[in-house]
Amino acid sequence: MEQKTLQVEGMSCQHCVKAVETSVGELDGVSAVHVNLEAGKVDVSFDADKVSVKDIADAIEDQGYDVAK
């Protein structure tokens, strides 16, 4: 199991938190998602054999937020 923290821009409310947690949490291989709205960070625990950091970032960007590269 790996853990990664992504810097995410554009989140401003609890709806944003729920959207990111749901979209990332539905990915196969993701075991935990925690969004820190104030810091603009998303902590993800995942199985790198099943899902990549790019897949996780894409899921966040699909919700309309920007992931720092």
Curated annotation (Swiss-Prot):
Q: Report the function annotation for this chain.
A: Chaperone that serves for the intracellular sequestration and transport of Cu(+). Delivers Cu(+) to the copper-transporting ATPase CopA. Functions in E.coli to transfer Cu(+) to CopA missing its first metal-binding domain.
- Please report what switches on or represses expression of this protein: By Cu(2+).
Origin organism of this chain? Bacillus subtilis (strain 168)
Q: Does the keyword Cytoplasm apply?
A: yes
**Keyword Transferase among UniProt keywords:** no
Q: What else is known?
A: The copZA operon is activated by CueR and indirectly repressed by YfmP.
Return the GO cellular component terms, semicolon-separated: cytoplasm
According to the record, the segments passing through the membrane are none
What GO biological process terms does the UniProt entry carry, in alphabetical order? copper ion transport
User: Its quaternary structure?
Assistant: Monomer in the absence of copper. Homodimer in the presence of copper ions. Forms a heterodimer (electrostatic interactions) with CopA during the transfer of Cu(+).
What is the name of the protein in this document?
Answer: Copper chaperone CopZ
Q: Which SUPFAM superfamilies match?
A: HMA, heavy metal-associated domain
Q: Where does Cu cation bind?
A: 13, 16
HMA domain residues are: 2-68
Keyword terms: Chaperone, Copper, Cytoplasm, Metal-binding
A single Gene Ontology molecular function, please? copper ion binding
One family from Pfam that matches here is: HMA
Subcellular location, record wording: Cytoplasm
Report which gene this protein is encoded by.
Answer: copZ
Instruction: Give the InterPro entries listed for this entry.
Output: CopZ, Cu-bd, Heavy-metal-associated_CS, HMA_Cu_ion-bd, HMA_dom, HMA_dom_sf
